[in-house]
Every structure is written in structure tokens, then in C-alpha cells.
Amino acid sequence: MSFLFGGPPKMSSAEKIAAAETEVEMVSDMFNRLTESCQKKCIPNDYREGDLNKGESVCLDRCVSKFFEVNIKVSEKMQGEAAQKQGAPGFGM
């Protein structure tokens, strides 16, 4: 009943595990999308060297930076919209 006094309801162990598993899946998905997208953009299919050259390395660095920048902006936008919905008059009443 802590939700009556402003605190969030307690999560059971099973709920905590499910939430952690969901978070791991989301992070894994984001990593896979990042890897696929930046590799496709920056690394040619015909490898000529064992290591990344300077151009490939710079491209990957910029790609990863942009990917996370966009991810942060999208997350902030979604959190703002969720907060507006929760604070909307008459919501849930």
C-alpha cells in the first residue's frame, strides 16, 4: 500500500528479474543495431587489411557518437511525452 503515500509499489523478485531480462534484451538489441548500422556504413565488404584504417576508425567513431546522440534525444522526447500524459488533467481518474 505504499503507492497510497506517494511511493511506488514494491516489485517482487520475479518482476525484478523480468525487468532486468527486458533491459538486457533492449541493450543487446541496441548494440546489435548499432554494430550492424555502423559496420555497413563504415567498413567495406572486401577487407584489405587486418586492422581498421584511419578512415574506417574515424567513420565508426562518428557513427557511434551520432547513434547515441539520437538515442538520447529520442529517449528524452519519449520521457517528456510520458510525463505529460501522466500529468494531464483527468488522466487515470
From Swiss-Prot:
Pfam families: zf-Tim10_DDP (PF02953). InterPro entries: Tim10-like (IPR004217), Tim10-like_dom_sf (IPR035427). GO terms for cellular component: mitochondrial inner membrane; mitochondrial intermembrane space protein transporter complex; TIM22 mitochondrial import inner membrane insertion complex. It comes from the Eukaryota. One of its GO terms (molecular function) is protein transporter activity. It is found in: Mitochondrion inner membrane. Keywords: Chaperone, Disulfide bond, Membrane, Metal-binding, Mitochondrion, Mitochondrion inner membrane, Protein transport, Translocation, Transport, Zinc. One of its GO terms (biological process) is protein insertion into mitochondrial inner membrane. A motif (Twin CX3C motif) lies at residues 38-63. Disulfide bonds join 38-63, 42-59. It is a peripheral membrane protein. Heterohexamer; composed of 3 copies of TIM9 and 3 copies of TIM10, named soluble 70 kDa complex. Associates directly with the TIM22 complex, whose core is composed of TIM22 and TIM54. Interacts with the transmembrane regions of multi-pass transmembrane proteins in transit. The twin CX3C motif contains 4 conserved Cys residues that form 2 disulfide bonds in the mitochondrial intermembrane space. However, during the transit of TIM10 from cytoplasm into mitochondrion, the Cys residues probably coordinate zinc, thereby preventing folding and allowing its transfer across mitochondrial outer membrane. Belongs to the small Tim family. Mitochondrial intermembrane chaperone that participates in the import and insertion of multi-pass transmembrane proteins into the mitochondrial inner membrane. Also required for the transfer of beta-barrel precursors from the TOM complex to the sorting and assembly machinery (SAM complex) of the outer membrane. Acts as a chaperone-like protein that protects the hydrophobic precursors from aggregation and guide them through the mitochondrial intermembrane space. This is Mitochondrial import inner membrane translocase subunit tim10. The gene is tim10.
